[in-house]
Amino acid sequence: VNDASDIDADRRHHRKRSRPFASGALSPLVGLPFSALLAIGGLALGAVLGPLPFVAVAVYLVMNAFYTFWLKTKQIADVFALTGLYIIRVVLGGLATGFLASSWLLAFCGFFFFSLALAKRVTEVDTAAAGGGVGLSRRGYRPTDGPVLKMMGVASGFMSCLVLALYIQNDVT
């Protein structure tokens, strides 16, 4: 659904133009109904696994839609949303396998995924800055945002390492 909402911009992007919707390999008339079926299937599987997995899948789908249609144009909020979506995947994996994610894992993932999401934005900002700022307006960033995003990403990456180090040194774990 996110790729379908970005189809015109993706067609103009040097790397994203090869995505199925943007390249024309998959029609949105086929892909969007199929994604609806997958969402329904995910909810059904979540319901089979129990109320908590069902709620987690539902929250993921709602948050994904919120990101697709609004948050991805908001500075920094988009990065927090991506981080949240990644963390929900970890939680769902734990629920599906019967191994609940520990607070250590969730803290590590929060900082690590935040760093990765920032790296994604830094790449987009730097690429756009090299091309005169083309393509940034739909994301809410400016070419001058790169240094701040980089500092935040590095700090978050260090925090994930700190959480991992504290976990390793903890006598209880």
Outline where the language-model segments fall.
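Acidic (Asp/Glu-rich) catalytic motifs at the cytosolic membrane interface
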Residues: 1-22, 71, 77, 118-126
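Short, function-defining helix-loop hinge/capping sites that tune catalysis or transport
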Residues: 10-14, 35, 72, 86, ...
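Hydrophobic alpha-helical membrane segments of integral membrane proteins
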Residues: 52-59, 73-83, 104
